[in-house]
Every structure is written in C-alpha cells, then in structure tokens.
Amino acid sequence: MNTIDKVRNIRISDYNYPLPDHRIAKHPLAAREQCKLLCYKVGGEISEGHFYDVPAVLPEKAMLVYNNTRVINARLRFRKSTGSTIEIFCLEPVAPCDYQLIFQTTQSCTWLCLVGNSKRWKQGPLTQEIEVDGKTVTLEANRGERRGNSFEIEFSWNGGVTFASILEAIGEIPIPPYLNRGTESTDSADYQTVYSHIDGSVAAPTAGLHFTDEVLAECDKRGITRRELTLHVGAGTFQPVKSENIGEHEMHYEFISVQRSLLVDLINAEGPVVAVGTTSVRTLESLYYVGQVLETTPDADEEMLTVKQWMPYSTPCEISTKKALQNVVDYLDRHHAEAYMGSTQLMIAPGFQYRIISGMITNFHQPQSTLLLLVSAFVGVDHWRAIYDYALDHDFRFLSYGDACFFQK
C-alpha cells in the first residue's frame, strides 16, 4: 500500500479518548501565563511546568512563529417581526474577496455564511436598525446562492460606516460550541491573543492565548527571535471527523499570508523553528509545497499554488526545504510582492514529514479531530496517547481555554 492510501485509511476511532465535560476549561485562568505546560521531547520523558516557563524551555536561538490573526465578531442576530431570531455566522468574504477590503466597505458586501434557524427565513430581506459610531444605521441581509450547508449573504446598509464597525457594534465573538455556553462579555478580550491585529478569523489560534506581554518580553531577553504570519481560522476548525476513515474527510480552505522577510529568516535560521499553534504549523509546512510547485512551474497561478489536502502524500519530495523556501522568495521578487498570499487545505496526519518546524506549542485537542492527527504526526503514533493519558491523570485542562503543551524534536 502506498503512502497516500495508508494515510487515507487511518481510522479516526484510533484517535478517540475519554474527555469528561468537567475537564474542558470553560474560561481561561485570570492570569493567562499561570496555566500548566506539558513538555515532551520526542524520544524523551514527559515533564510539566507553567506557561511562564516557555522562555526558559525554548531551545537556544529558537525562532518563535505565531499567528497574528484577530477573531472578528462574526455572529449577527436578526429578530423577525414574528419573534423568531435568525443567526448569521460570517465565515469568509465573497465580494470583495479580500479580507482587508471587505472590512472597509461602506455600502454593501457579500459573505459566505452559516444561517441558524434558516427554516424561519422564508423569503425577502432581514432588516434591523442599529447604532454605529453614534449614527442610526439600517442593516439589511439578503440570502443568495446556497453552497453546501452555507449561503451567500449580501449585507447592505446606509450611513457611510464600515462593515468592520458594524461587526464591532452588534456582532458577537463566536466561541467554540464545545464550551457549551453562550458568549460572555469577557470573551471579547479572553478569546484574542495579545498580538492579534489582522481581522479575519472566526476562531482564535488558541495556543497563543497563553502569551502575555511579559512572557514575550522575556523571550526577547533570552534572544528568542519572534516572527508572525497570518492564517484566518475558519469554522472548519470545530468540525469533527465524522467518517470512519480520514480519507473521506474534507478539510476547509483557509487564507494564509507570509511576509517575504519571514521566508528569508526561515532560510537563514540558525536555530529551531517553533510554531505557536496548529494554524502556524499548517501555514509554515504549506510553504514547502508552494515552493515545490514553483520548482517545476515558476509561473504557476494562484490555483496551482493552493496547497491541497493530500499533496504531501501524493507528490514526491525531491527538493530541500531551503530550496523550496527560496523558490517562494524568488516568486515574490518576480511579482514585486512583499508577502505570499494564498490558500491551504493541508491535512497533517501520521505519514507526514515535517520540513520546517522542529517544535510546536499547542493546546490539548478534541478526540477524533484533525488537530490530534497533526500532533500524532509530530510526536509519533505510539506517543500521543501516553501524553494525553498523562494530562488526564495530572489534572490538565483541555481545549481552547485549557492548558498548553510544548513538543520538540
């Protein structure tokens, strides 16, 4: 059986474990950096400390790479005259399709959205009057084309305010469904990393929630290089694998942006690259496959450069990591661009060869999730369960607001 068939035939039931509800952290600790930290070096022993120890446990000359995306207030509620409430959950921009542009629109825009209670939305627009920046604004939502379980929704409004300010005024932070609670006022701060500044995600890159300005400053003191990238996290991050084998599970495409300067730093890195969170892992590892396409097709278009789900398992890896990264730099230079922007659908599962990172900081993930597959691919199929058993036996808190892990090769 070849590699891709082996990977596609992985049974998701092999990545199940018992997770009692009381082990799921419903809120973060008052002091983020006080959370517990499980450390594991592949082939070594498990140890534990606290997140404020991260600057001390990172290897010498490490490069810490984190995701600077910011969670948007993506949930909008419209109350109908009949009394029923329709919830619209903005997933990704359609028109304009550029994240920065769509937030700055001042009259209309279209998003791909999930619609809650859609059976109550028979026809016609939904409207509501809202207060935005001291102005009374009429916001209208029109339902368009259906795409799978989502709809294209066109929003239109008056008053000359931006769509970003509308979301800030009436939108809600979309906390994960497995918290089994509604959004609270504290989530608007708790569910953002201290370094988030690029609007676009509908879920936080939660490994970064533990960082404080003080922890980052201590990293600087110890000579740890800090760099950032962008992956806008989609709702697919909450989606469990429902098929028996992972080959039947389809990953969502997500927008990524990587500065040319980071690519150059990765090429010249003297120490290990440590990714903060699975979103940073997937973005960094996707770069190798972008560079691999450019090796044979230097003038590849956006579609050809999109990293597909099974690409790592079906394409021979014949060039070095540095060559792949240099190909991306050269591509940017030919196009006079300062950042690579594209999409990734990358699935990392056992059988995947990590090419760029040699360490990751991450949380404890849901049973039977693609994120658990990613961790298993890094620490080893035989070791992920021992790590999770240890965490369950030693009172670690799980999922988005829970405790953290540091894994290194």
How would you describe each model-predicted region?
Residues 2-409:
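Surface-exposed, charge/polar-rich loops and edge strands
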